[in-house]
Amino acid sequence: MPVTQGSGALPARRIVFVHAHPDDETIATGATMACYAADPDTQVVLVTCTLGEMGEVLVPELTNLRADRADQLGGYRIGELEQACTELGVTDYRFLGGAGRWRDSGMLDSPANDDPRCFWRANMDDASEALVRIVREVRPQVIVTYDAIGDYGHPDHIRAHDVTVRAFADAADPDFAPDAGPTWQVSKLYETALSHSAVESAVDRIWRSDLAKTVPEGITMPSDMLLSVPDTKVTTTIEAPGFFAAKIAAMRAHRSQMTVDGFFFALVDGNGRSAKATENFVLARGAVGPGSGSGVETDLFDGVATR
């Protein structure tokens, strides 16, 4: 949960990750978060927008937690998130507006989209203010979230993007929520990205293994698989092989949402053997840093003044 800086001094580098549900932080940015969390001069803050109440339950003994049964999955996933953050070394993790403020919206065009409590229906002023309060407190140089289509079109991912983009501007506006603390201009806003080459490599690996039979029915790869971006659009690549084990351990912590022998786990981590802990990003706001000479940044803080 939130960590208070006792002396009032801020770490030199500060980064906020905004994700939709518990487990998204690990799947999309787990290695990156673990890498930065291990740096004593960097503060990593995770903001999760919902409890993930509408998630599927892949563990038979937990099926009664589902939304159409006891509707207790959200509380259970708080514990999973806590364990995952422990594995990643992240000590400052928060829910936007407080735990349960906005409910998981479910998949696009599902009845859950109509629930007035869901994040998809969130008032943008209210949601932005909730994030602005965190931004003005933490004063991050960098914020990370999804792209405009939410990586794969999930309403909560789309809303997380929209709220983050809005808060990026609102945090620097003295007329917006003046009681939320001194204004702060974030230097960079990044969107998570799957590159074409990474997806093609993962797909090829799956089709060449016994995992092909675990591909969900109806998916024809690669055309109907995960959305990806051209490699040339990627502005930043974080390679953190030393934190690959932490990412896998964090994925295992989300036991209600994924199995270690299935299609999705293999797609993300290369079946736990050959894949590197490489995560890609596209800079959406701010200036691209000098990079490492290849034209691609290797640090989300590249070119940012730390203070």
Swiss-Prot record:
Catalyzed reaction equations: 1D-myo-inositol 2-acetamido-2-deoxy-alpha-D-glucopyranoside + H2O = 1D-myo-inositol 2-amino-2-deoxy-alpha-D-glucopyranoside + acetate
Matching PANTHER family: 1D-MYO-INOSITOL 2-ACETAMIDO-2-DEOXY-ALPHA-D-GLUCOPYRANOSIDE DEACETYLASE (PTHR12993:SF26), N-ACETYLGLUCOSAMINYL-PHOSPHATIDYLINOSITOL DE-N-ACETYLASE-RELATED (PTHR12993)
Name used for this protein in its record: 1D-myo-inositol 2-acetamido-2-deoxy-alpha-D-glucopyranoside deacetylase 1
UniProt keyword annotations, A-Z: Hydrolase, Metal-binding, Zinc
Keyword Hydrolase set for record: yes
Gene Ontology biological-process entries: mycothiol biosynthetic process
Binding site for Zn(2+): 21, 24, 157
A GO term, aspect molecular function: N-acetylglucosaminylinositol deacetylase activity
Cofactor: Zn(2+)
Cofactor note: Binds 1 zinc ion per subunit.
Family per similarity comment: Belongs to the MshB deacetylase family.
Name of one Pfam family that matches: PIG-L
Role played: Catalyzes the deacetylation of 1D-myo-inositol 2-acetamido-2-deoxy-alpha-D-glucopyranoside (GlcNAc-Ins) in the mycothiol biosynthesis pathway.
EC number: 3.5.1.103
InterPro entries, sorted: GlcNAc_PI_deacetylase-related, LmbE-like_dom_sf, Mycothiol_biosynthesis_MshB
Matching Gene3D superfamilies: LmbE-like
Taxonomy of the source species: Bacteria, Bacillati, Actinomycetota, Actinomycetes, Frankiales
Domain of life: Bacteria
Hydrolase as UniProt keyword: yes
